[in-house]
Amino acid sequence: MGFGDWFKSALSFLGLYKKKATIVFVGLDNAGKSTLLAMLKNSATTTVAPTQQPTSQELVMGSIRFKTFDLGGHEVARQLWEQYVTNSDGIVFLVDSADPSRFEESRRTLQELLDNHDLATTPILILSNKVDIQTAVSMETMVQSFGIQHLLTGKGGSNLRSDQRPLEVFPCSVINRFGYTDGFKWLSKYL
């Protein structure tokens, strides 16, 4: 490690250096991607129209400056995901936990990301959104439905093999403002 890298590490440790990262927000339509980004930017809930084309904005959380891309979740928009996700430092995948009828479609969509060799070590944060709604399934049920229990790497930020992808699920409610902060703290450890 050269002096420049050491200096940046020291400043980052002290919270005086801002890292930059590109984060892509994906998931099926109506999962809460745009609502979450609006909440992070404006600290207020707003009614958000379905995303028709990719949008980008910059956010600062802690010592990290995020360039975010909100990609639509409808079937046609998903065809554009690959050109964004392959250049990202991290992926936030939102799942509507109150709509288990779409779990299979969401699982297949997530599996396409997991199978993409360009993303083999890209951290993926899965936010199981809308857990506050009565019809929401438990996080454990969602994880089992997606068949990813063996891929989860733990919430503690444990040491991973260099070829291992950080992957974890956090329950949240974007509207009620809970759960996603823990997920972003976890993700920031891998950026």
Curated annotation (Swiss-Prot):
Membrane topology, as annotated: Peripheral membrane protein
Residues noted as binding GDP in the record, renumbered to the chain: N30, A31, G32, K33, S34, T35, N129, K130, D132, V174, I175
Species in which this protein is naturally found: Giardia intestinalis
Pfam family, one: Arf
UniProt subunit comment: Homodimer; upon association with membrane. Part of the coat protein complex II/COPII, composed of SEC23/24 and SEC13/31 heterodimers, that it helps recruit and assemble on endoplasmic reticulum (ER) membranes at ER exit sites.
Similarity remark: Belongs to the small GTPase superfamily. SAR1 family.
Gene Ontology MF terms in the entry: GTP binding; GTPase activity; metal ion binding
Tagged with keyword Transport: yes
Listed GO CC annotations: cytosol; endoplasmic reticulum membrane; Golgi cisterna membrane
Keyword list, A-Z: Cytoplasm, Endoplasmic reticulum, ER-Golgi transport, Golgi apparatus, GTP-binding, Hydrolase, Magnesium, Membrane, Metal-binding, Nucleotide-binding, Protein transport, Transport
Ranges in coiled-coil conformation: none
One Gene Ontology biological process: intracellular protein transport
Descriptive protein name: Small COPII coat GTPase SAR1
Binding site for Mg(2+): D29, D70
CDD domains, per the entry: Sar1
Swiss-Prot/TrEMBL catalytic activity: GTP + H2O = GDP + phosphate + H(+)
Entry EC no(s): 3.6.5.2
Top-rank EC class of the record's enzyme: hydrolase
UniProt function note: Small GTPase that cycles between an active GTP-bound and an inactive GDP-bound state and mainly functions in vesicle-mediated endoplasmic reticulum (ER) to Golgi transport. The active GTP-bound form inserts into the endoplasmic reticulum membrane where it recruits the remainder of the coat protein complex II/COPII. The coat protein complex II assembling and polymerizing on endoplasmic reticulum membrane is responsible for both the sorting of cargos and the deformation and budding of membranes into vesicles destined to the Golgi.
Superkingdom field: Eukaryota
